[in-house]
Amino acid sequence: MKRVYFIGIGGIGMSAIARYFHAKGFNVCGYDLTPSPITDQLIKEGIEVHFSDDLNMIPKAFFSPTDSLIVYTPAVPADHSELTYFRSNGYRVVKRAEVLGEITLMERALCVAGTHGKTTTSTLLAHLLKQSHVDCNAFLGGISNNYQSNLLLSDKSDLVVVEADEFDRSFHHLKPFMAIITSADPDHMDIYGTAENYRDSFEHFTSLIQSGGALVLKYGAPVNPRLGSDVSLFTYSSDDQQADYFASDIMIRDGRLFFTWHYPGGQLEGVELGVPVRINVENAVAAMAIAHLNGVTVEELRSGIASFKGSHRRFEKVLDTERVVLIDDYAHHPVELDAAIHSVREIYSGKHIMGIFQPHLYSRTADFYQDFARSLSMLDEVVLLDIYPARELPLPGVTSRLILDLIENPNKTLVSKNDLLDYLHGNEIPDVVLILGAGDIDRLVIPVKQYLQTLC
């Protein structure tokens, strides 16, 4: 195999694998639906990307079934003409998760799964290992602010940190040496159908942990592990002392966050979290546990936690001035919205907070619109955008207005994505603006930031 072609190369997981093959010397190119900051960066790195579902756009060298591997994301529709062509003409066509499983099979994979928190936890775990004497490789589900990439490579470590995605049961292709499960709140009901099926998928994932490995499971998570007899089980919590790993003495002071980390046989006091948000304490406890189990010393943990800068779009402070603060967050599930909004309320107590939310998927909106409305009602002002459909076709009667009508706050409105800047221009800007969503709302972050800067 000499060449790898990606259908959906702009996805966060796909782009990491594309970068991996490019770094290993393969000829790499791909298709995506629209340009994005990720595709812009891939092009800068020398990877050819086009944005039309058109076989004529693919370099001729890739039309060789014996030399070319075709990788696609499940988000691509089944009738995509490029995908259909390759499937019909003898090419090896595989999902992203299958390739990731093969890449990690010969290494010791540290896999982070969960409905929420897996990107921050895996990125933090990778940083703890990377800045220690242990080192690691990593395929991340977000862009690390420490390394400005979603791919980390090492020439000395056989550890690989992997964000284990439950969508389409993708994480069943992995063979973890150790794993973290951060949560198992039902999601992707269009795939799983029931909450029981969703949780069963996580339980099957635990059965894949290799002999001699370990599972670090959030204390109280609704998952019954199916572990081999020689796989260790540990629990963790942000504050419950019944867990094997937990935090205590959590203190936020002058914009800084400190806590004590407890582990079997000891504790580490005065740990400072580089991203001082309370929701990250729990993620830190889990990441520190796996890092410690793999040889990172407690003092290396202390320095690594303090130097962690977070991930793009994970409670990322984009603008911080005396006039206004802009925070960008990937939250797209009600539990994630709750966490983000509670964190903003805690950090900016007494401030007027506006949330701009773009619902993600018609199916998720239909499942959770009441919960979304309940979460958003905690804000002082709510701006709703239209639903981002991603891979889905519209569902009858499912629009953002379902959420809007149930928000218990008169300061609410529904605007189109294209009209958002005009809306902001015409209204009083509050103390804090919180951008929320997993769709293409990220493309509005810079324009919103630029406008807010004119007010300072």
Curated annotation (Swiss-Prot):
Binding site for ATP: 114-120
Pathway the protein takes part in: Cell wall biogenesis; peptidoglycan biosynthesis
Keyword ATP-binding listed: yes
Molecular function GO terms recorded: ATP binding; UDP-N-acetylmuramate-L-alanine ligase activity
Enzyme category, top tier: ligase
Catalytic activity of the protein: UDP-N-acetyl-alpha-D-muramate + L-alanine + ATP = UDP-N-acetyl-alpha-D-muramoyl-L-alanine + ADP + phosphate + H(+)
Function: Cell wall formation.
Similarity field: Belongs to the MurCDEF family.
Annotated protein name in UniProt: UDP-N-acetylmuramate--L-alanine ligase
Transmembrane segment boundaries: none
Keywords assigned: ATP-binding, Cell cycle, Cell division, Cell shape, Cell wall biogenesis/degradation, Cytoplasm, Ligase, Nucleotide-binding, Peptidoglycan synthesis
Location relative to the cell: Cytoplasm
GO cellular component: cytoplasm
A biological process from GO: regulation of cell shape
